[in-house]
C-alpha cells in the first residue's frame, strides 16, 4: 500500500470533511477551510519574523527558537487550531503543494495526537498539550505523550534541501509529502487515468509526470518523485537493466 493505515485514514477523513469532489486541480485552500480547524495565510517574501509579527498583531506573544529566514511554508498550531503560512509569490502549483504538505503535518503530527490523547485521558489533557500545565504522573507515562510537542507546535517547509534531515525527521517529512500528494492527486484516480503501457520506464514515468502536472497541478519536483513511486508500487517501475542506467 502506498500510504500507511494512519495516513490513509487522515486522507479519507479530509476528503469526507472537506467535501472534496472530482474537480482537479484541487482548491486546497478551500478544502482546508472546510475540513480542518485551520486557516491559510499568504505572505509575500515569507520569513519567520513576518509570521511572528502576524501572530503579535493578533495579541499573542510567540517567537521561533531559531533565527529568522525565508521559508516556503510554515505551520503554527495551538489550542487545537492551526495557521498555515505560505509564500504568496511562489507559483500556484508550489503554493498548492505547500498548503497540502503543511495540512498533512497538522493532521498527522498535531491534531491526531491531540485527539487520541483527549480520547484516552479526557479533555483536560488538552491543557498539557497547550503548555498550560504539567502532565500528571499517570499522563506522563502514557505513550501518547512520548515525543509530543507541548505548547505551540511549529513546522517549517524550507526553500531548498540544504537542511535535509535524516532518520525520524525524514520519515515524518516523507509521510507528510505522501499525504499531501494523495490529497492533491489520489493514487487510485491517477492510475485509473494514466496510460502505463509503454515498454520503456522513462516513457511510463513521463506519462504519469505529465498527467500529475497538467491535470492535478503538481509542481515538477514532487510530481517526478510521485510518478516514480506510483509506478514502482504497481510493479511498473524500472527493470533491473533500466535501473542501472538511472544511477
Q: What label would you give each PLM region?
A:
Residues 1-247:
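Active-site hotspot residues in diverse enzymes, especially metal/ion-binding acidic/histidine motifs
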